[in-house]
Design a protein with these regions (language model features):
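P-loop (Walker A) phosphate-binding loop of NTP-binding proteins
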Residues: 13
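Short hydrophobic/aromatic beta-strand immediately N-terminal to the Walker A/P-loop
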Residues: 7-9
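Post-Walker A helix-loop "phosphate-sensing" segment adjacent to the P-loop in P-loop NTPases
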Residues: 27-35
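Conserved lysine of the Walker
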Residues: 18
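Conserved nucleotide-sensing/catalytic segment adjacent to the nucleotide-binding pocket
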Residues: 34-35, 43, 47-91
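ATP-dependent NMP and nucleoside kinases share a basic, alpha-helical "lid"
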Residues: 95-149
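NTP-dependent small-molecule kinase module
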Residues: 102-103, 165-194
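Hydrophobic positions on the alpha1 helix immediately C-terminal to the Walker A/P-loop
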Residues: 21, 25
Length: 194
């Protein structure tokens, strides 16, 4: 492992502000950051129809190929490039594409459940949890999923009620205890001081 590589994990609920925090960190470390998103490690479901895939629970640990992400993060820490899978939210499946990712001085690992897995968590030097009110997270998720992922308002609300909220309470919120830093209010206050 390269001791000169810093791995920062950013977790938090859906719509909490993880991407905003990540982008702020990237802007302060320009050219030195590699990002690896847990979303790209959703399991492949080529054997299912779109309708079947749209009914899956994407907010539980079993939805992810976290062992592949652990392997990829270990490779990056060793100084090796990886071919990261790409998940397509519009079809609820991985695409055939990959992203060539090279290690840099800082690796940011981002996702709702990255602190839930001990093996993955132990590869991180700093663990940041973005803590945001549930109503704000829901509003952000609706806006994002309708505008960027081609979902209907009804499908977003159903998914939130059926899986997102219960899985947040079961897995995401409890994983906050593994954070070194908890950023309140989605980082709104924190960025005023930096």
């Amino acid at each position: 492992m390269d001791d000169n590589i810093l791995v920062i994990g950013i977790a938090g609920g859906t719509g909490s502000g993880k991407t905003t925090l990540m982008n702020n960190l990237i802007s302060r470390c320009e050219g030195m950051v590699t990002v690896i998103s847990h979303d790209n490690y959703y399991k492949r479901h080529d054997d299912m129809t779109y309708e079947e895939r749209s009914q899956l629970n994407y907010d539980e640990p079993a939805a992810f190929d976290t062992s592949l992400m652990v392997y990829h993060l270990e490779e990056l820490r060793r100084g090796h490039a990886i071919e990261c899978p790409v998940y397509d939210f519009t079809i609820h499946n991985r695409s055939e594409q990959t992203i060539h990712i090279v290690p840099k001085k800082v690796i940011i690992v981002e996702g709702i459940l990255i602190f839930e897995n001990e093996e993955l968590r132990n590869l991180m030097d700093i663990r940041i949890f973005v803590d945001t009110d549930a109503d704000i997270r829901l509003c952000r998720r609706i806006k994002r999923d309708v505008n960027k992922r081609g979902r209907t308002l009804e499908s977003v609300l159903k998914q939130y009620q059926d899986t997102v909220k219960p899985m947040h309470e079961r897995y995401v919120e409890p994983s906050k205890k593994y954070a070194n830093i908890v950023v309140p209010e989605g980082g709104k206050i924190w960025w005023r001081w930096t």
